[in-house]
């Protein structure tokens, strides 16, 4: 079995690689080429939750299981908010062939989901980005946004002003190669003002921005909400949106309050949720048709992403001779 750390993975994969891997995963889901049961969630103490996400793809001769645990208060103790491990299994023998740092893989593939959405649904010419939230997923989300479009500026907002400022400074240095200014915003209104691309990545149970202030032509990726009673997306933006698209329509309509709450309140219907990003890739549904429409992308994550990401990373690591062999 090959053990792959965060540093091993960094050596063999780029964000653009991950965006393409996510596109492959989303296409496989809508093509029926991967078995991805809905995740199992066990709610624990301390506002924590344990998530189990299996997937199997005969075409890849591989299966995967990710265990990811969501503990939002970890950030107060300088701990990761979503520790995880990803297990890659040989589809021919059933042997576990790799164990990957699932926290980092999750950060990459979740960020890449927004990147794939922006690449497929965003305007071709975008100048400004906005991101609300600075937790464990935020850095990869920001990089994916920058990898998808050449931006001049990205504003960051978090309720913790000190953490927001420190994050912006760290990202300005760490993502300097993309050439964008990364600056802290005064508030959420300031953050999303004139933004072409918007990411929300928070554990909030209530909307984190004013949906009436989203500009025409914006693409919004909602990342943080995975429970029916939580909604970080302001429902006010939904009637203004020409399209609502998900990473998985089935999963999103089973899990996220961003959609379930406005559906229950009669603001939108299930039919307003057009489909999955894989349907856009396949041409089954249209993506962006003009530079004025607002498009909302809802991502809850599907196990196919973990499987494809783990397989791509594993193959590249074997080729590059990276990782630690264990039990052989």
Task: Please report, for each region that a protein language model flagged, where it lies by residue.
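N-terminal ligand-binding/catalytic initiation module
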Residues: 1-107, 115, 125, 275, ...
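Adenosine-phosphate binding glycine-rich loop
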Residues: 6-8, 230-328
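Short helix-loop-beta connector
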Residues: 121-128, 150, 215-216
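Conserved beta-strand elements of the Class I
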Residues: 129-130, 295
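Glycine-rich Rossmann-fold phosphate-binding loop(s) that bind the pyrophosphate
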Residues: 134-135
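N-terminal Rossmann-fold NAD(P) dinucleotide-binding loop
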Residues: 138-139
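NAD(P)-binding Rossmann-fold cofactor-contacting core
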Residues: 148-174
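Rossmann-like adenosine-cofactor binding region
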Residues: 177-267
């Amino acid at each position: 079995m090959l053990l792959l750390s965060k540093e091993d993975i960094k050596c063999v994969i780029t964000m653009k690689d991950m965006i393409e891997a996510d596109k492959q995963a989303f296409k496989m889901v809508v093509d029926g080429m991967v078995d991805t049961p809905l995740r199992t969630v066990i709610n624990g103490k301390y506002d924590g939750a344990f998530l189990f996400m299996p997937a199997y793809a005969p075409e890849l001769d591989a299966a995967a299981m990710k265990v990811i645990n969501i503990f939002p208060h970890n950030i107060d103790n300088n701990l990761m908010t979503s520790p995880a491990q990803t297990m890659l299994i040989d589809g021919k023998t059933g042997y576990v062939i790799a164990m990957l740092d699932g926290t980092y893989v999750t950060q990459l593939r979740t960020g890449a989901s927004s990147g794939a959405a922006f690449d497929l649904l965003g305007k071709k010419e975008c100048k400004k980005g906005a991101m609300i939230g600075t937790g464990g997923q935020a850095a990869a989300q920001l990089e994916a946004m920058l990898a998808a479009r050449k931006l001049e500026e990205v504003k960051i907002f978090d309720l913790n002003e000190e953490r927001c400022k420190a994050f912006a400074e760290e990202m300005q240095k760490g993502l300097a190669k993309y050439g964008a200014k990364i600056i802290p915003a005064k508030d959420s209104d300031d953050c999303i003002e004139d933004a072409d691309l918007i990411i929300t990545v928070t554990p909030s149970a209530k909307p984190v921005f004013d949906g009436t202030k989203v500009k025409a032509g914006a693409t919004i990726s909602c990342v943080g909400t995975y429970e029916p009673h939580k909604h970080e997306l302001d429902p006010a933006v939904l009637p203004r949106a020409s399209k609502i698209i998900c990473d998985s329509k089935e999963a999103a309509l089973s899990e996220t309050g961003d959609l379930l709450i406005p559906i229950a309140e009669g603001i939108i219907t299930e039919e307003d949720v057009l489909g999955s990003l894989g349907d856009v890739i396949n041409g089954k549904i249209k993506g962006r048709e003009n530079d004025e429409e607002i498009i909302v992308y809802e991502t809850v994550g599907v196990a196919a992403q973990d499987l494809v990401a783990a397989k791509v990373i594993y193959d590249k690591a074997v080729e590059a001779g990276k990782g630690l062999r264990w039990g052989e």
